[in-house]
């Protein structure tokens, strides 16, 4: 029996809801009208962090600091423990998580916390060919204050595979949505680009979709085999500043970018 892919939606005071993938046909047409991402300035602050299933005790303190004036939090390896769910619903209007796989108690996967409801939501999963576990991605679209629609892609890429066929397939499944979207895009997360082959596949993919890479002056991103694992790509936006924050609250350091 094929397992259905879905997102789990958390909203304060409401029952937990399963959200199934919306049709890509809606991207080529008119999406529902939404409420703009709340921002007191013209800048959009985005945080990207592999939170390591909250295995280190200081995760909540660091995450609380990161939420200050951030409209979007893109987490990877977010395990929906009561503590994380309480944090998400207390600090953000809505949180969507894609369970990559079910742990004994709480599912783990990518999770996007936002200050407004998405007008489009499509969870994706790809199975690790060697470990037979899944990695997840989440595509959401939000209204901006200038009435443009922002596509946000939260990615945790396949890690263990021979060659890059499955890795590229995961990216290409995301690309189907990006190609149909008219407007700005942010694609970010843990891309596990630890080999030359993987990095080249990622670069080809982002060039094809006209996505630019965010660079960091003081680059403290987590490294594996001499290459960074975490990236932020974008189009039709400008960067005000971009930083990496060193921390021992996870095995990855969070990335923070202000767009305008």
From Swiss-Prot:
Q: Which UniProt keywords apply?
A: Cytoplasm
List, alphabetically, the InterPro entries matched: Endo/exonu/phosph_ase_sf, Endo/exonuclease/phosphatase, UPF0294
- Highest taxon listed in the record's lineage: Bacteria
Primary location group: cytoplasm
Tell me which SUPFAM superfamilies the record gives. Answer: DNase I-like (SSF56219)
Q: Per its record, what are the GO molecular function terms? A: catalytic activity
Q: Name one GO cellular component term.
A: cytoplasm
Q: Does the keyword Cytoplasm apply?
A: yes
State where the protein is found. Answer: Cytoplasm
Q: Name one Pfam family in it.
A: Exo_endo_phos
Output the HAMAP family linked to this UniProt entry: UPF0294
Which family does the similarity line name?
Belongs to the UPF0294 family.
Q: What is this protein called?
A: UPF0294 protein plu0699
- Species for this entry: Photorhabdus laumondii subsp. laumondii (strain DSM 15139 / CIP 105565 / TT01)
């Amino acid at each position: 029996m094929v397992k259905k892919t879905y997102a789990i939606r958390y909203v304060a005071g409401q029952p937990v809801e399963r959200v199934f993938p919306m049709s890509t046909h809606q991207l080529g047409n008119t999406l529902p009208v939404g409420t703009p991402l709340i921002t007191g300035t013209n800048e959009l602050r985005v945080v990207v962090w592999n939170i390591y299933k909250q295995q280190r005790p200081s995760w909540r303190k660091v995450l609380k600091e990161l939420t200050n004036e951030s409209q979007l939090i893109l987490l990877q390896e977010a395990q929906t423990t009561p503590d994380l769910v309480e944090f998400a619903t207390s600090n953000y209007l809505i949180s969507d998580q894609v369970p990559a796989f079910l742990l004994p108690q709480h599912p783990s996967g990518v999770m996007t916390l936002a200050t407004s409801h998405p007008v489009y939501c499509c969870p994706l999963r790809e199975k690790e060919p060697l470990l037979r576990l899944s990695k997840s991605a989440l595509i959401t679209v939000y209204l901006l204050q200038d009435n443009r629609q922002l596509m946000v892609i939260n990615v945790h890429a396949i890690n263990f595979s021979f060659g890059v066929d499955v890795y590229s397939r995961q990216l290409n499944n995301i690309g189907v949505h990006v190609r149909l979207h008219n407007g700005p895009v942010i694609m970010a997360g843990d891309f596990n680009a630890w080999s030359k082959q993987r990095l080249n596949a990622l670069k080809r993919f982002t060039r094809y979709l006209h996505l630019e890479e965010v660079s960091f002056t003081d680059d403290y991103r987590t490294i594996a085999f001499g290459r960074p694992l975490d990236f932020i790509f974008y189009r039709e936006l400008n960067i005000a500043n971009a930083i990496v924050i060193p921390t021992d609250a996870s095995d990855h350091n969070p990335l923070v970018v202000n767009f305008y």
